Amino acid sequence: MNFEQVKLEYDFYDLEPYIDTLTMETHYGKHHASYTKNFNEAVEKAGLSNKSVEEILSTLSLVSDQALRDSLQNNGGGYYNHNLYFSVMSPKKGTKPSLALEEAINRDFGSMENLVEILQNLALGQFGSGWAFLSSDKEGKLYATKSANQNNPFMEDGHNTPILAIDVWEHAYYLQYKNLRGDYVKNFFKVLDWEKVSKNYEHCK
């Protein structure tokens, strides 16, 4: 299996002014492309070409070679996390969660407003490089978490599936926002497509 970058359903300039064209070109065209290339090389070396990325990331402890395990973790996480990140954004305005996702959000977080605030605080509170995630278990319960570097919930518990990812590595925002991570995180929600997040949620159950 050759892992490929997610195909964007929008042009690099479509997320302006919230995420600018240069950031998109660099982030998707260079950083994400590099993670994808390096992950494929590590997968081939490990003899895991018959496994899905989810299977690989949730069973990293089975890889005995430390250097190879680190490469799979770092590049596989970078590949998977970026695929999710780029796939849940769009230029569409005013998207809404499905009824099922809305009910789950209200049940597990009290309201959409509470969830957004929690995710923003997680993204801002991540020291250094990392991610904030909204994930679901197989029963549909939602979890808001953060992870360092290219880690994600697959690696940390092996059960919960991320349905939304916020990249807070500096390469995701520094060209446009410089050190103003908070402005970037706030504006991320202006290009977040809740319809896509809802589809991810449905696939978890």
Label each residue range with its predicted role.
Residues 1-205:
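Feature for soluble, non-membrane regions of globular proteins
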